């Protein structure tokens, strides 16, 4: 008598996708971080989109817009906390995903590794562009945190950091 999960037409699909998945025997929970990265990214995009509908970036009204989101917008408080904690979770999953690849020697497969390094550089470039590249309109915190390693370069570090910042334009707490 055959097992129902292998003979029933609908259950057979679920069985071949989840139970008898054709995967290596050494696969572990470490291999879930790529999927978790996708979930975190989708969460960041959705919550960020809804938060941006109510946020004001002017330094005089930014705090009031955040309190408006938390108090007056339906489930605004949970959107804010999901967005903030989702960003942390995204980077935790990112570092664990790269760490898993390093641990298991995935860098030996150069094509696959380079396909993975490309989105990593894209994430870093997005962070850089979001905080530093709008010359004259950048966040002081973002500019100093992202470019503080540049200022450690001997002789040219300070000038290089100021050039990346766009001169002495870093002055306010928010992007306006």
Curated annotation (Swiss-Prot):
Q: Where is the protein situated, by its record's location annotation? A: Mitochondrion inner membrane
Segments traversing the membrane: 33-53, 77-98, 113-133
Report the co-factor binding details: Binds 2 heme b groups non-covalently.
Which processes are annotated in GO (biological process)?
mitochondrial electron transport, ubiquinol to cytochrome c
GO MF annotations in UniProt: metal ion binding; ubiquinol-cytochrome-c reductase activity
Q: Name one Pfam family in it.
A: Cytochrome_B
- UniProt-listed PANTHER family: CYTOCHROME B (PTHR19271:SF16)
What's the subunit arrangement here?
Answer: The cytochrome bc1 complex contains 11 subunits: 3 respiratory subunits (MT-CYB, CYC1 and UQCRFS1), 2 core proteins (UQCRC1 and UQCRC2) and 6 low-molecular weight proteins (UQCRH/QCR6, UQCRB/QCR7, UQCRQ/QCR8, UQCR10/QCR9, UQCR11/QCR10 and a cleavage product of UQCRFS1). This cytochrome bc1 complex then forms a dimer.
**Protein name as catalogued:** Cytochrome b
Q: Which organism is it from?
A: Myotis leibii
